[in-house]
Regions:
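C-terminal alpha-helix plus adjacent terminal tail
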Residues: 36-41, 61, 65-68, 72-128
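Crotonase-fold acyl-CoA enzyme core
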Residues: 3-76
Length: 128
């Protein structure tokens, strides 16, 4: 992984100079943008460019396991929380908190069902 277009004089016009600093911070982003060097998996993980590294040949299996894990969660709240996290970037704290509340409020029925299941003893120790 890397910003290989640097080697050929091709500018980053695909949003790379905007998105990369938001993902890994300005220092790491400038390092990658300016040098065009290759980044190995362990370094990408350390700098926050990726969230997980799996052994060679196991990427599909790991991706499917993650997809199944996410699919098992209540979907309305999962989607609302994801949307809130994405929308909050760059917002003032108070505005982001209000937006989070607005999105979460729409999912309260699902949350009450989940709380009832937990109170009944389900879901303890991370198991459902």
């Amino acid at each position: 992984m890397g910003v290989f277009c640097r080697r050929f004089g091709v500018p980053l016009i695909d949003g790379g100079t905007v998105r990369l600093p938001r993902l890994v911070g300005l220092s790491h982003a400038l390092d990658l943008i300016m040098t065009g060097r290759k980044v190995e998996a362990d370094e990408a993980l350390r700098m926050g460019l990726c969230n997980r590294v799996v052994p060679t040949g196991q990427a599909l299996e790991a991706a499917l396991a993650l997809a199944h894990q996410l699919a098992a969660f209540p979907q309305a709240t999962l989607r609302a929380d994801r949307a809130s996290a994405l929308a909050a970037e760059g917002l003032p704290l108070q505005q982001a908190l209000l937006q989070e509340w607005a999105g979460g409020r729409e999912c309260l029925a699902e949350a009450l069902r989940g709380a009832s299941r937990f109170a009944a003893g389900q879901g303890r120790h991370g198991e459902f």
